C-alpha cells in the first residue's frame, strides 16, 4: 500500500466509501460492539510534553494528580466495569517509562484483573523487551502505545520522545506476543496528508495492530493545543471518511472511537459505526476527561440494534 493509494481510497464519494467499509466490517465482525473501560491508575506529573495532554508536568492544568493507585481500588473498578458489561479493562499511567519500583505491583494488578475474567490492556509509556516479556507472563493481552500523528507532524506535538522510540516499544510488544493497540489523534492542526501518513505508518508497524483507537482532540485549558483551539480541528465528514478508510485498510482490527466522542452527536456516532467503528470506551470517564455517558451509549446501541460482546457471550 502506498500513500497515493490511501489518498485514492479516501477520495471516493462518501456513500461509496461507507458501503465498502460496511461490507468489509460485516464480513469480519458482524453486528457486535466491543465495550472497554479505561482507568487512570497514575495521574499527572508526566515528564513528556505532549501538547494535547493535561497530564503533562510541563503545563498548568486542573487535573487531580495521584501516584499509582493501590491494588484493591483498581480491582474494585475492574469488577464494576465487568458488571457493567465491559469486556476489557484498560489501565493508563502517566509515565515516560514505568519506574522499576512500580513494575512488580503493576504486573500483579494485571494478573488479578485477568483472573476476574477480563481482557487486560495497559499503557505505561515506553517499555523494553524484558519488560514486555514480563508483562506477557503476568497475563497482559494488549499494550497501547499510540503513534499520535504522522512522523512529519510529530515534532510539532511532542519533543520529549522520538517517533522511532514509539516504534521500538511496539516492536518489543509484538515480539513478546502481546496484541498491539495503536492509533492516533485527529484534529490537532495536522493536514490531510498527515492523516494519510499516520495510516501508512500503522500499516508498516512491526505487527499489525489488533486494536486501533481513533481519538479526536479534546482541547484542555492549560495545554498548548487547549489554549490554541476550542474544538477538534476536524469535521464529522472528515472523521467518518478517515474511519471508513481505516476499516478498508485494516479489515480485521477493532476500531475504537475513543477520546472526543462525548462531543459528537448521536447522528455522527451512528455514521462512525456505519463506517467501521466496532469498539468504544464504556463509562462516564476516560483518563481525566468526560466520556459519553453510559445512559447515552445504552440508548444509542439499543436504537441501532447493536449488541455488546457481553450480550453475545
UniProtKB/Swiss-Prot annotation:
Textual note on the cofactor: Binds 1 [4Fe-4S] cluster. The cluster is coordinated with 3 cysteines and an exchangeable S-adenosyl-L-methionine. Binds 1 [2Fe-2S] cluster. The cluster is coordinated with 3 cysteines and 1 arginine.
The reaction(s) this protein catalyses: (4R,5S)-dethiobiotin + (sulfur carrier)-SH + 2 reduced [2Fe-2S]-[ferredoxin] + 2 S-adenosyl-L-methionine = (sulfur carrier)-H + biotin + 2 5'-deoxyadenosine + 2 L-methionine + 2 oxidized [2Fe-2S]-[ferredoxin]
Keywords from the UniProt entry: 2Fe-2S, 4Fe-4S, Biotin biosynthesis, Iron, Iron-sulfur, Metal-binding, S-adenosyl-L-methionine, Transferase
Gene Ontology MF, one: biotin synthase activity
Keyword DNA repair among UniProt keywords: no
Stored InterPro entries: Aldolase_TIM, BATS_dom, Biotin_synth/BioAB, Biotin_synthase, Elp3/MiaA/NifB-like_rSAM, rSAM
Enzyme class: transferase
A Pfam family that the UniProt record links to this protein: Radical_SAM
Location of the Radical SAM core domain: 28-258
Assembly behavior: Homodimer.
Family listed: Belongs to the radical SAM superfamily. Biotin synthase family.
Protein name per the record: Biotin synthase
Organism: Francisella tularensis subsp. mediasiatica (strain FSC147)
Gene field: bioB
Amino acid at each position: 500500500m502506498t500513500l497515493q493509494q490511501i489518498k485514492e481510497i479516501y477520495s471516493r464519494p462518501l456513500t461509496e466509501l461507507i458501503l465498502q467499509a460496511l461490507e468489509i466490517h460485516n464480513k469480519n465482525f458482524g453486528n457486535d460492539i466491543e465495550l472497554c473501560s479505561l482507568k487512570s491508575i497514575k495521574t499527572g506529573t508526566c515528564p513528556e510534553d505532549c501538547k494535547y495532554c493535561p497530564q503533562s508536568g510541563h503545563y498548568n492544568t486542573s487535573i487531580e494528580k495521584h501516584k499509582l493507585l493501590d491494588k484493591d481500588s483498581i480491582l474494585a473498578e475492574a469488577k464494576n466495569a465487568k458488571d457493567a458489561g465491559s469486556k476489557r479493562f484498560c489501565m493508563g499511567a502517566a509515565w515516560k517509562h514505568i519506574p522499576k519500583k512500580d513494575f512488580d505491583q503493576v504486573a500483579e494488578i494485571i494478573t488479578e484483573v485477568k483472573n476476574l475474567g477480563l481482557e487486560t490492556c495497559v499503557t505505561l509509556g515506553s517499555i523494553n523487551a524484558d519488560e514486555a516479556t514480563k508483562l506477557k507472563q503476568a497475563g497482559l493481552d494488549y499494550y497501547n502505545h499510540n503513534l499520535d500523528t504522522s512522523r512529519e507532524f510529530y515534532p510539532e506535538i511532542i519533543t520529549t520522545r522520538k517517533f522511532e522510540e514509539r516504534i521500538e516499544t511496539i516492536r518489543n510488544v509484538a515480539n513478546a506476543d502481546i496484541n498491539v493497540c495503536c492509533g492516533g489523534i485527529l484534529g490537532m492542526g495536522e493536514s490531510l496528508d498527515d492523516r494519510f501518513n499516520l495510516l501508512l505508518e500503522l500499516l508498516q508497524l512491526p505487527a499489525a495492530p489488533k486494536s486501533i483507537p481513533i481519538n479526536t482532540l479534546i482541547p484542555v485549558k492549560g495545554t498548548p493545543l487547549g489554549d490554541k483551539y476550542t474544538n477538534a480541528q476536524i469535521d464529522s465528514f472528515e472523521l467518518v471518511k478517515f474511519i471508513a478508510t481505516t476499516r478498508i485498510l485494516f479489515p480485521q482490527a477493532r476500531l475504537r472511537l475513543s477520546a472526543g466522542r462525548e462531543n459528537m452527536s448521536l447522528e455522527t456516532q451512528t455514521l462512525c459505526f456505519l463506517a467501521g467503528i466496532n469498539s468504544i470506551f464504556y463509562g462516564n470517564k476516560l483518563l481525566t476527561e468526560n466520556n459519553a455517558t453510559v445512559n447515552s451509549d445504552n440508548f444509542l446501541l439499543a436504537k441501532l440494534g447493536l449488541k455488546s460482546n457481553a450480550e453475545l457471550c
